[in-house]
């Protein structure tokens, strides 16, 4: 009986050991899998790399470069292409020389076709607003009356031409006489006044419809108004209603 109990106890002890080992393996495997899952879920701090863009290279072309001929004579460059050291102590109307340098991005040559940056220009001592009218361009006005006594003036903004050199500001205001045309011809107005003046055709042509209606319904003022208009249009006293000049 005792011999049968001992093997039974040994078997139970062996089963307990195997059960303990199996539970230990299960627990240890679960912890490892949980740790692995946690590591996958939370990978920890990550490194971020910031890409610093390269500084954009300036490729803009200055607007004045479009006016500057490439590899031309430096002395013939437009005024917008050069910087000159000027002074206002020169004598008006006398020749004077100034030291000049080309602006950035401008290339020019001397008389020997060698690249040049600094040079001398010759000009007449006078301010830009003292130039002849052929050396600058001014804005035109179509809102003033050209046929008036005394003649009307209007404020204009004038700009010196590119190839002309002068002292002071190259853009300046100036009062100019009204001098614009609306497309009316003096010969046409005179011909209408002679042939169809009794019906007011000359006045209608010039845009003076009120006077035209008066001549039409009065048959040219019985001829008197027609003769007067022929004289007034002939000497240029009667002009277009918009205040412009004849062509």
From Swiss-Prot:
GO CC entries: plasma membrane
Cytoplasmic side: 201-215
Membrane-traversing stretches: 180-200, 216-236
Pfam families: TM2
Keywords, sorted A to Z: Alzheimer disease, Amyloidosis, Glycoprotein, Membrane, Neurodegeneration, Signal, Transmembrane, Transmembrane helix
Entries under InterPro entries matching the protein: TM2, TM2D1-3-like
One GO process term, biological-process aspect: positive regulation of Notch signaling pathway
Linked pathology: Alzheimer disease: Alzheimer disease is a neurodegenerative disorder characterized by progressive dementia, loss of cognitive abilities, and deposition of fibrillar amyloid proteins as intraneuronal neurofibrillary tangles, extracellular amyloid plaques and vascular amyloid deposits. The major constituents of these plaques are neurotoxic amyloid-beta protein 40 and amyloid-beta protein 42, that are produced by the proteolysis of the transmembrane APP protein. The cytotoxic C-terminal fragments (CTFs) and the caspase-cleaved products, such as C31, are also implicated in neuronal death.
Family designation: Belongs to the TM2 family.
PANTHER family reported for this sequence: BETA-AMYLOID BINDING PROTEIN-RELATED (PTHR21016), TM2 DOMAIN-CONTAINING PROTEIN 3 (PTHR21016:SF7)
Protein name: TM2 domain-containing protein 3
Source lineage: Eukaryota, Metazoa, Chordata, Craniata, Vertebrata
